[in-house]
Amino acid sequence: MMFNNENYKDYDQELWEAIQAEEDRQEHNIELIASENMVSKAVMQAQGSVLTNKYAEGYPSKRYYGGTEYVDIVESLAIERAKKLFGAAYANVQPHSGSQANAAAYMALINAGDTVLGMDLAAGGHLTHGSPVNFSGKTYQFVGYTVDKETEKLDYAAILKQAKAVQPKLIVAGASAYSRQIDFEQFRFIADQVGSYLMVDMAHIAGLVAAGLHQNPVPYAHIVTSTTHKTLRGPRGGLLLTNDEAISRKMNAAIFPGLQGGPLEHVIAAKAVAFKEALDPAFTDYARAVIANTAAMAEVFAKDDRFRLISGGTDNHLFLVDVTKVIENGKLAQALLDEVNITLNKNAIPFETLSPFKTSGIRIGCAAITSRGMGVDESRTIAHLIIKALVNHQQPEILEEVRYEVRRLTDAFPLYKKN
């Protein structure tokens, strides 16, 4: 064989050292970024398979290349498992990302310049829900809905009133930083009232939906988009679902040839593994634990007057905290916690007054620590460690104590046990 570099450790020491450093970071950091999780070794093995060698433009049994009989099996497995997992009639597992899935949904349902009603970024929406710096805001006329100023929860009556005034061609439901259950049936009612399509982006809550712990949007939305990582605990990638045959043809055409060429069949194989894992009853136990851990952690902040828990609580895998009583902004909080090996992100809060590069809040998610096996006791401990670090951010000796406690926790719950 022409290759003499079968072991990348020996062939590319510089790259190997960087990957080893990242593995060490993941092993010894408490990961609280709500959009991140830890995949199984089986998912990683599938993604590292020989399927990376195969080009397969098109769809199973309708390819533009030969030699696709086995990748057809792989992709068909992923499709059928996704359909079963979410109760959908049609699934497309080819999107490279959630953003690609959202772009395809827009292409399938509306035209450039059409009016779309989506969740405002500061209220908890996503860049692809109409941010002016994103393709969505540049291509379509997005109008943002927000949350109630008092409750910081979605106000469906207000959204209906806004929809009647705006008359959108499409309504987008779903969020990247909203800690409450979303009523997709209500959103479909609103869409029907104004003759609009409904698209649901369930990227953050897909694992909870799969486990039956959040209302399933598939019966209500014309198209559902998702990522396959986050709470679903699969590889980084996207997913499209629908119950409408005509729309399924449009969304498939939007992905290929509209947005993408050859699908990443090695990633699709990893998606198939993740879907099988999510169909296992043990995954429901995992999702329940995620919700319990998040609630336990949020409760600690709710009881501390120095912090403000956005919307007063959480129903899912994440929550937001206003930290400005103890530290200047979310950016500084994120950087400080990085120093003690707790990883999370700064985040705008509803009706934000600071720059999006600074923010008043932080976003905390518990999917990854739950994958490590941590429970409600550890979740409360982590919350207290975060508070201890933020309140004492100018006291190096206390920060060192926090760093030590973080290491004790991560050592007790290893990420990938060494063989």
From Swiss-Prot:
Its cofactor is pyridoxal 5'-phosphate. InterPro entries: PyrdxlP-dep_Trfase, PyrdxlP-dep_Trfase_major, PyrdxlP-dep_Trfase_small, Ser_HO-MeTrfase, Ser_HO-MeTrfase-like, Ser_HO-MeTrfase_PLP_BS, SHMT-like_dom. GO terms for molecular function: glycine hydroxymethyltransferase activity; pyridoxal phosphate binding. Its EC number is 2.1.2.1. The record marks H229 as: Plays an important role in substrate specificity. It catalyses: (6R)-5,10-methylene-5,6,7,8-tetrahydrofolate + glycine + H2O = (6S)-5,6,7,8-tetrahydrofolate + L-serine. It is found in: Cytoplasm. Pathway: One-carbon metabolism; tetrahydrofolate interconversion; Amino-acid biosynthesis; glycine biosynthesis; glycine from L-serine: step 1/1. Gene3D superfamilies: Aspartate Aminotransferase, domain 1, Type I PLP-dependent aspartate aminotransferase-like (Major domain). Catalyzes the reversible interconversion of serine and glycine with tetrahydrofolate (THF) serving as the one-carbon carrier. This reaction serves as the major source of one-carbon groups required for the biosynthesis of purines, thymidylate, methionine, and other important biomolecules. Also exhibits THF-independent aldolase activity toward beta-hydroxyamino acids, producing glycine and aldehydes, via a retro-aldol mechanism. Belongs to the SHMT family. This is Serine hydroxymethyltransferase.
